[in-house]
C-alpha cells in the first residue's frame, strides 16, 4: 500500500529539526536526508542554529567562543533569541512559505535544554523569548539523535582533530549526561512531534530510521515514497 501524502497544507514546506548531544551525528544525518529528499524532487534546504543567516552567524561565533557564558545564562539566552529571530524571519519562514522543506540542525529545544535545564534560565523567560522569536512556528517533526555520552564526545573529538573544543564540548561529563536526559524528557513530553532515534549505529542504519520516522508521520510525498523503493 502506498504511503500517505502530505495533509491539507501540502503547499507549505515541511520543517524538520534535529536535536541531540555533542557528536550525535546531526549534521551528517541532515545532509543525508536532504540528498534523499532532493533525489525525490522535493526542494529542501539545510540550516543550523545558532546561525543560519548572516546576522545569526555573527552571534554563533560569540556564543561558541565562550563569550555568552561569561555574560551569564540569561544574557546568553538573549543572544540565542536574537540569532533565532533573524534566522526564523529571514530564512525559515520564507522557505516554508515557498513550499521548501527546511532541515535545521538545532532549534528551540536546544535552548530549552542548554540554557533552561542546564543553565537554570526560568521557563517564563524561555516562553517569552519563544513568543517573540518563533510565535506559532512549530517543527513538523523533531528528530532527537541519541548516543551514549562517551561515544558522542569521542566523535566530537575526532571531528575537530587538533582544534580546541567549543564552549559546549568543553563542559564536563556530568553536563553531557544531564543534556542527554533532558532531551529524552522533551521527547517523552511531546511524543507527537518528537522521535528519539538510536544513533549509536552505522550511518545507513541511522538514516533508515530517520526516513522511517518521516513515513510514520505521513510527511513524505508520493515522490519520496517512490524514491524509497528505488
From Swiss-Prot:
Phosphorylation of dTMP to form dTDP in both de novo and salvage pathways of dTTP synthesis. Its EC number is 2.7.4.9. GO terms for cellular component: cytosol. NCBIfam families: DTMP_kinase (TIGR00041). Keywords: ATP-binding, Kinase, Nucleotide biosynthesis, Nucleotide-binding, Transferase. It holds the Pfam family Thymidylate_kin. Belongs to the thymidylate kinase family. This is Thymidylate kinase. It comes from Nitrobacter winogradskyi (strain ATCC 25391 / DSM 10237 / CIP 104748 / NCIMB 11846 / Nb-255). Coiled coil: none annotated. The lineage of its organism: Bacteria, Pseudomonadati, Pseudomonadota, Alphaproteobacteria, Hyphomicrobiales. Signal peptide: none annotated. SUPFAM superfamilies: P-loop containing nucleoside triphosphate hydrolases. One of its GO terms (biological process) is dTDP biosynthetic process. GO terms for molecular function: ATP binding; dTMP kinase activity. ATP binds at residues 20-27. It catalyses: dTMP + ATP = dTDP + ADP. InterPro entries: P-loop_NTPase (IPR027417), Thymidylate_kin-like_dom (IPR039430), Thymidylate_kin_CS (IPR018095), Thymidylate_kinase (IPR018094).
